């Protein structure tokens, strides 16, 4: 067995048992990355830095100073600013941007001993559901339909993170989720991803898309690995005013914990039109597994669900239109010259942003404009409040909610790229938790008829990642999902 | 009708002006509103800029608690409502000196609500200006257009500095009132220590809203609150001296009247005052006005204040100008005018109070507000830096009180004090300026004078006003040191003048 096939937990155990060194483990990953360039998961490989960090990690371990992630090589979504390492948000406008600072989340991973392998591809500024809006080109999903060589999307926006984990190009990866950008790619690639409660992870040093929705989280090979990573990534940061000053438990202790007696809500509104039968079946399997594990299944209603997607596609672009105003060619990043100030702005932003980013900036600018604000933005905020209340009501009946993660399995690259609405529909099951600030986890629970992975989502109460991990652990155990993408790259 | 309203004569009849001000006061704070970067005047370009101020990717604002405290303190000083819940919003527009592409401000939920400022006119009468609101916001950086013919330079040192925008209601009716309001506001802010009030550095500057109307219209507005009774207003941006405020208003009111009298209509617009030409000119019209797309800043939580914290700030408020003035009048028997001069800054009043301890307070007030103030002003300094300590003024007054020197001699002594010759008693001693109270010496001088001028001594009996000549001669003969009271008394007796 190759070192890259290990789970994060197994690798850390192996390092602790001196079965191999971090340098060996890291080198194995660097080789795997080099061999997998066709997937386009990494847009920047940092092998020298990785080996250097690994050697230092081995030295720390030799001194008995091992942190919880000591020696584990990870990938970093290129939305996290990394000190001295180019950070682009997969845009042209930040193509050559090198931060002088390290995001809080990644600095906590390095604090705990992890090793950085490089920067991972994503949809430009995290805007997309297929990784196709990346300035560096799309990521190809390591998974293919049985008997097909058609290139599939790994989902988005954290497509690079999900593909890298699925193809064993890292032991785990950082990701971010504004409307489903951790969970949908996790579902498309047979990996585990969790978006924690809004405020669990600091947003400081993460290139902003929509501030009130953005949350960092991990993509990992197992529920336990995700718990390990999230424990390290979470925590109060005084540099982020929306960061919660609440203790972070060791999330791994909840994985494998009995779920007996827990009430699991099944929201009827998540049974959408045209949902593939296989996804409906998977959902039923999940219900059956949890029943067997001793959970009580409760039918619940989240009546405003149908308004979530439209509300999301008003709030997120509105915030984005303002957050992205700083990319103006004045202080850093791309600058295209012009005859006057307005032309410099126009040329820089026309050239520096891709179509999807421009679309969202325009939508956002529109919904905040005088005369439209009340009808769109303010209305969307009201809907958001109703959606949060739906969940508040649900929590009087259940402890966690089980839904499918995405309405389909991975689709072909190019299939939806000319139809923004079809693309936005990918987020239909995931945006609600962003709007309500709740934790949501996706884990692989089965394959469809084409042999492609499908995910189930577990939604928890605010700050109750513990229950989410317990339920996910139970589903993982019952599903016994062990399939891996067959290596073709 | 307010008798202080100034009527402006036009070709078609009388006009009046209506003025409202938005004053931007830089919060006195060592660091910026949302970043830890230092605030200070005189640093090199872009030396006081943090990653947050430069709006680097992924940077987030964190509210400076001290700036909030300063705003609350100011609100309390303006006798205004403190809003326990307020919110920060983004005001979106593009400009090179605005790195984020938006200014963090407070739109519809400001930290401070309605209040009132009592303002003194030059003639000593007072009027109230109602405060509409006070909100916190970030300042922008500075664009320097004069460094290079083909480029604009940007200095971000000021970017992110905390400002308080204090918005008045349209309660001022003359340019003098507007200037007096800004003066009073500045005094209050400086008392509170919430703004240094330095207008030259732009730390206090005003946007002036000017409109004109016919006599009677303003009263209708005040009765109904309906702005339709008032004329269309123009906003003159960033005026940073009392004189410019007055000039800008006078010019602008005239300009609007001329338009209206020519049958035109005033366009609502933003204008700039050009101090070299004494004119206002159009900056942008209402049609060109930005759509700022205000929305709540999602990087910041709503600002919720603990009432106990607000109360603790209230308890530490210093004595404010109005209260101090009233106390100086009642405690020391000062005139409203003297008290008004003394309270212009707290140091002045403190100086007075220290010097007046155990002395004739009115006399001390005279010396402080006249001689000393004149000297300090001429030297371009203030009471905190006075070369003469309050104990010197106290001693000088004591010497007058106990008859050692006359008031006239005291002025001479004061000149020597200012010249650095020592304490008043030493100067009097050294220069032999002690008043002659010895009746014998004075009598001798008077007798000599009468003997030498018998005709004048005779004439004065019918013309008592000629007594002054004798007084002058006696003073001259005694080198000005004779006690004037004694001289007068003895002269009257000897000359038989009642």
Swiss-Prot record, chain A:
Domain of life from the UniProt record: Bacteria
Keywords: ATP-binding, Ligase, Nucleotide-binding, Protein biosynthesis
Catalytic residue list: 77 (charge relay system), 157 (charge relay system), 181 (acyl-ester intermediate)
GO MF: ATP binding; glutaminyl-tRNA synthase (glutamine-hydrolyzing) activity
GO CC annotation, single: glutamyl-tRNA(Gln) amidotransferase complex
Catalysed reactions, as listed in the record: L-glutamyl-tRNA(Gln) + L-glutamine + ATP + H2O = L-glutaminyl-tRNA(Gln) + L-glutamate + ADP + phosphate + H(+)
Family membership noted in the UniProt record: Belongs to the amidase family. GatA subfamily.
Protein's name according to its UniProt entry: Glutamyl-tRNA(Gln) amidotransferase subunit A
UniProtKB/Swiss-Prot annotation, chain B:
Subunit annotation: Heterotrimer of A, B and C subunits.
Transmembrane intervals: none
Keyword set, alphabetical order: ATP-binding, Ligase, Nucleotide-binding, Protein biosynthesis
Catalyzed reactions per annotation: L-glutamyl-tRNA(Gln) + L-glutamine + ATP + H2O = L-glutaminyl-tRNA(Gln) + L-glutamate + ADP + phosphate + H(+); L-aspartyl-tRNA(Asn) + L-glutamine + ATP + H2O = L-asparaginyl-tRNA(Asn) + L-glutamate + ADP + phosphate + 2 H(+)
Gene Ontology molecular-function annotations: asparaginyl-tRNA synthase (glutamine-hydrolyzing) activity; ATP binding; glutaminyl-tRNA synthase (glutamine-hydrolyzing) activity
Pfam families: GatB_N, GatB_Yqey
Group of enzyme by EC: ligase
PROSITE patterns, A to Z: GATB
NCBIfam families membership: gatB (TIGR00133), PRK05477.1-2 (NF004012), PRK05477.1-4 (NF004014), PRK05477.1-5 (NF004015)
EC number: 6.3.5.-
Native source organism of the sequence: Caulobacter vibrioides (strain ATCC 19089 / CIP 103742 / CB 15) (Caulobacter crescentus)
Protein name in the entry: Aspartyl/glutamyl-tRNA(Asn/Gln) amidotransferase subunit B
UniProt record similarity statement: Belongs to the GatB/GatE family. GatB subfamily.
Presence of the UniProt keyword Cell cycle in the record: no
Function recorded in the entry: Allows the formation of correctly charged Asn-tRNA(Asn) or Gln-tRNA(Gln) through the transamidation of misacylated Asp-tRNA(Asn) or Glu-tRNA(Gln) in organisms which lack either or both of asparaginyl-tRNA or glutaminyl-tRNA synthetases. The reaction takes place in the presence of glutamine and ATP through an activated phospho-Asp-tRNA(Asn) or phospho-Glu-tRNA(Gln).
SUPFAM superfamilies registered for this protein in UniProt: GatB/YqeY motif, Glutamine synthetase/guanido kinase
Database matches in InterPro entries: Asn/Gln-tRNA_amidoTrfase_suB/E, Asn/Gln-tRNA_Trfase_suB/E_cat, Asn/Gln_amidotransferase, Asn/Gln_tRNA_amidoTrase-B-like, GatB, GatB_C_1, GatB_Yqey_C_2, Gln-tRNA_amidoTrfase_suB_CS
The UniProt record lists the keyword ATP-binding: yes
Database matches in HAMAP family: GatB (MF_00121)
GO biological process: glutaminyl-tRNAGln biosynthesis via transamidation; translation
Top-level taxon in the UniProt lineage: Bacteria
């Amino acid at each position: 067995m190759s070192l890259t096939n290990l789970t994060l937990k197994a690798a850390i155990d192996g390092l602790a048992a001196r079965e191999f060194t971090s340098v060996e483990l890291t080198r194995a990953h660097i080789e795997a990355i080099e061999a997998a360039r066709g997937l386009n998961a990494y847009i920047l490989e940092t092998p020298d830095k990785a080996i250097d960090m690994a050697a230092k990690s081995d030295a720390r371990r030799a001194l008995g100073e091992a942190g919880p992630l000591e020696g584990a090589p990870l990938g970093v979504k290129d939305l996290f600013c990394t000190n001295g390492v180019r950070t682009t948000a997969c845009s042209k406008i930040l193509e050559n941007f090198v931060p002088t600072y390290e995001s809080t989340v990644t600095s906590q991973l390095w604090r705990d001993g992890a090793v950085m392998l490089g920067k991972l591809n994503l949809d430009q500024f995290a805007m997309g559901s297929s990784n196709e809006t990346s300035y560096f080109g799309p990521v190809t999903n390591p998974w293919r339909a049985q008997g097909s060589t058609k290139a599939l999307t790994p989902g988005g926006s954290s497509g690079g993170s999900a593909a890298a984990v699925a193809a064993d190009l890292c032991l785990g990866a950082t990701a971010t989720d504004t409307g489903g950008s951790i969970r949908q790619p996790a579902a498309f690639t047979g990996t585990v991803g969790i978006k924690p409660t809004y405020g669990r992870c600091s947003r400081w040093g993460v290139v902003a898309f929509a501030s009130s929705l953005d949350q960092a989280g991990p993509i990992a090979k197992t529920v336990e690995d995700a718990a390990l990573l999230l424990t390290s990534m979470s925590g109060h940061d005084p540099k982020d005013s929306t960061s919660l000053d609440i203790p972070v438990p060791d999330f791994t202790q909840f994985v494998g914990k009995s779920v007996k007696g827990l009430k699991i809500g099944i929201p009827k509104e998540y049974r959408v039109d045209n949902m593939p039968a296989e996804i409906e079946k998977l959902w039923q399997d999940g219900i059956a597994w949890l029943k067997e594990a001793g959970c009580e299944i409760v039918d619940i209603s989240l009546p405003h669900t149908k308004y979530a997607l439209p509300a999301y596609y008003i709030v997120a672009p509105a915030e984005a239109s303002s957050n992205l105003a700083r990319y103006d060619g004045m202080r850093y990043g791309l600058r295209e010259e012009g005859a006057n100030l307005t032309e410099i702005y126009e040329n820089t932003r026309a050239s520096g942003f891709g179509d999807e980013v421009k679309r969202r900036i325009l939508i956002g600018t529109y919904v905040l404009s005088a005369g439209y604000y009340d009808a769109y933005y303010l209305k969307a905020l009201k809907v958001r409040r109703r959606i949060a209340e739906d969940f508040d009501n649900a929590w009087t009946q259940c402890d966690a909610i089980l839904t499918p993660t995405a309405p389909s399995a991975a689709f072909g690259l190019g299939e939806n790229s000319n139809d923004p609405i079809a693309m936005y529909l990918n987020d239909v099951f995931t945006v609600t938790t962003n709007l309500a600030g709740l934790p949501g986890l996706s884990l692989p629970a089965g394959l469809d008829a084409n042999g492609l992975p499908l995910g189930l989502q577990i939604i928890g109460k605010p700050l109750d990642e513990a229950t989410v991990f317990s339920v996910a652990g139970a589903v993982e155990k019952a599903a016994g999902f062990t399939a891996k993408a067959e290596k073709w790259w | 009708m307010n008798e202080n309203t100034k009527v402006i004569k036009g070709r078609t009849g009388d006009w009046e002006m209506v003025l409202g001000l938005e004053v931007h006061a830089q919060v006195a704070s060592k660091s910026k509103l949302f970043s830890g970067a230092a605030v200070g005047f005189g640093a090199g370009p872009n030396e006081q800029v943090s990653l947050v101020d430069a709006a680097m990717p992924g940077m987030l604002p964190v509210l400076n608690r001290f700036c909030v405290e300063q705003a609350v303190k100011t609100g309390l000083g303006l006798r205004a409502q403190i809003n326990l819940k307020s919110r920060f919003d983004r005001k979106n527009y593009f400009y090179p000196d605005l790195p984020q592409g938006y200014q963090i401000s407070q739109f519809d939920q400001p930290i401070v609500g309605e209040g009132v400022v009592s303002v003194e006119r030059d003639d000593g009468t007072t009027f109230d200006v109602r405060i509409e609101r006070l909100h916190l916001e970030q300042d922008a950086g500075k664009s320097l257009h004069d460094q290079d013919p083909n480029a604009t330079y940007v200095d971000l040192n000021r970017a992110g500095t905390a400002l308080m925008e204090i918005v008045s209601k349209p309660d001022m009716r003359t340019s003098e009132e507007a200037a007096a309001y800004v003066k009073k506001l500045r005094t209050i802010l400086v008392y509170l220590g919430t703004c240094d009030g330095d207008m030259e550095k732009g730390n206090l500057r005003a946007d002036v809203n000017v409109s004109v109307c016919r006599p009677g219209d303003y009263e209708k507005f005040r009765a109904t609150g309906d702005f339709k009774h008032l004329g269309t207003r123009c906003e003159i941006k960033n005026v940073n001296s009392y004189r410019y405020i007055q000039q800008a208003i006078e010019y602008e009111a005239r300009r609007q009247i001329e338009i209206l009298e020519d049958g035109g209509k005033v366009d609502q617009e933003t204008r700039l005052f050009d101090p070299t030409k004494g004119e206002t000119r159009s900056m942008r019209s209402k049609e060109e006005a930005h759509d700022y797309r205000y929305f709540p800043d999602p990087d910041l939580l709503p600002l919720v204040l603990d009432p106990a914290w607000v109360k603790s700030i209230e308890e530490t408020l210093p004595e404010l100008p109005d209260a101090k003035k009233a106390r100086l009048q009642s405690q020391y028997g000062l005139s409203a005018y003297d008290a008004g001069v003394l309270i212009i800054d707290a140091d002045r009043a403190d100086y007075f109070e220290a010097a007046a301890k155990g002395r004739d307070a009115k006399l001390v007030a005279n010396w402080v507000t006249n001689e000393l103030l004149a000297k300090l002003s001429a030297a371009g300094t203030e009471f905190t830096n006075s070369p003469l300590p309050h104990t010197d003024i106290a001693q000088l007054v004591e010497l007058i009180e106990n008859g050692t020197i006359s008031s006239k001699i005291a002025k001479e002594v004061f000149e020597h004090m200012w010249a650095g010759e020592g304490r008043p008693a030493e100067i009097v001693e050294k220069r032999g300026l002690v008043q002659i109270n010895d009746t014998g010496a004075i009598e001798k001088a008077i007798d000599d004078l009468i003997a030498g001028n018998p005709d004048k001594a005779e004439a004065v009996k019918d013309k008592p006003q000629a007594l002054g000549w004798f007084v002058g001669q006696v003073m001259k003969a005694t080198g000005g040191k004779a006690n004037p009271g004694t001289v007068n008394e003895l002269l009257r007796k000897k000359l038989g003048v009642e």
